[in-house]
């Protein structure tokens, strides 16, 4: 019987061979409905912050998409000591849970005038930084337009945009070269 993989991972089989580093021992009494998230959402979200972006204390960050992975990016940002943590989602019902995970500001792109990029740039300006822009952004949507917005809302000179979301097969992302020439960085990550 063939085993169909998603990103090289399989769990719907009677036996699976994997490296020791990929195994985590859990207590026998650990509730499966809670620990089942550890294998992807938690490690992917927190790992993107800690391992891929290496977010530092005091950073300004944006998370696009507040589902399971996005919430854990928020949690990772809180653990890393980010000061401003902006969540972006089309669903206002996600705001309360996102605040619980560490979000400090919420933007629903359907409820603002103008672009979400300009909204974030304006929100991150300070008296000492009139350019604005997030130090870090994270895409947890898999939407290529959102991936572009995530890059373009980061700060000129040092902004990093981390792509976590998986786009549809064959999809392409694009931006103006100026966005990268001015010091922004696009990175991808899988499983944190």
PLM features: residue spans?
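NAD(P)H dinucleotide-binding glycine-rich loop of Rossmann-like/cofactor-binding domains
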Residues: 1-64
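Glycine-rich Rossmann-fold phosphate-binding loop(s) that bind the pyrophosphate
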Residues: 41, 65-69, 166
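Hydrophobic/small residue at the entry helix of a nucleotide-binding pocket
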Residues: 44, 69, 77
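Adenosine-nucleotide cofactor-binding segment
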Residues: 63-66, 78-149, 170
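Glycine-rich phosphate-binding loop and adjacent beta-alpha segment
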Residues: 82, 143-192
């Amino acid at each position: 019987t063939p085993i169909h993989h998603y990103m090289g991972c399989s769990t719907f089989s009677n036996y699976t061979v994997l490296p020791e580093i990929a195994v985590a021992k859990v207590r026998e009494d650990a509730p499966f409905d809670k620990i089942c998230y550890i294998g992807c959402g938690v490690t992917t979200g927190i790992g993107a912050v800690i391992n891929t972006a290496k977010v530092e204390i005091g950073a300004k960050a944006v998370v696009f998409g507040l589902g399971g992975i996005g919430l854990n990016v928020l949690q990772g940002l809180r653990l890393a000591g980010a000061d401003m943590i902006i969540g972006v989602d089309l669903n206002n019902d996600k705001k309360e849970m996102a605040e619980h995970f560490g979000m400090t500001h919420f933007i629903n792109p359907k409820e603002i005038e103008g672009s979400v990029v300009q909204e974030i740039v304006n929100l991150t300006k300070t008296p000492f930084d009139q350019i604005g822009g997030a130090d870090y952004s994270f895409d947890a949507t898999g939407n290529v337009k959102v991936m572009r917005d995530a890059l373009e809302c980061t700060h000129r000179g040092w902004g990093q945009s981390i792509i976590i979301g998986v786009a549809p097969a064959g999809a392409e992302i694009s931006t103006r070269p100026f966005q990268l020439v001015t010091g922004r960085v696009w990175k991808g990550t899988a499983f944190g």
